[in-house]
């Protein structure tokens, strides 16, 4: 295994680790890009990105895991771009660097939780993206989800008791404390594209030949709750065109070693299955 530091981007402000196999790499293999998960560095939760990078490198896929600008070891990017715009610029800087230095032509981008925004944004912006994986990405409630969600709560005495306690506790809060709780909700809430917009964007990517995998854990019990929900929540015909993986026993960050190892194998296996040879992409309309 060969791992080395890469410094690149505007004013050489971005820092990452490139992982490759000591053996001759598959010249047709796309390069995999991994970035931050929330505020965590390029290591990923529980070092999952380190494990995935080494697992994929052993199969001939080069992997760059790097910190987006202003995070980890990467400098703040100057200019007036928004956070999402900066993330796309950072990802494209990584692709440009790997293309110039190593001849990389195609890429698979993986976004975990809020990292989905960067992966999805650069997939739309850059035709060099051949594959995209969301882990705990965009999710929307469906009618089936709501029926299941409400039935579980209506039939649970424990949940009724907890609800009663929470309401009593809230009544004891001052107006300022209640306002503070509302502000915290806003801070930790992400803006999702509408279902209709996301559906059109996915159609655009699929038309271009981009392979897509969406992974969800069972931890999101307020939005996503069953296998196949992806295909019911989107106003488009994506079954058989987008791959979905639902892991009901895992938590949001796949914290336990067995769940993390299983996810690494599932992601690596999907990439091996879909990108054993050079991807064919359509750049026209």
Give, region by region, the residue ranges found by the protein language model.
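Serine-hydrolase catalytic core
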Residues: 8-9, 50-52, 151-284
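Glycine-rich "HGGG/HGxG" loop immediately N-terminal to the catalytic nucleophile
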Residues: 66-82
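Alpha/beta-hydrolase active-site loop
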Residues: 80-101
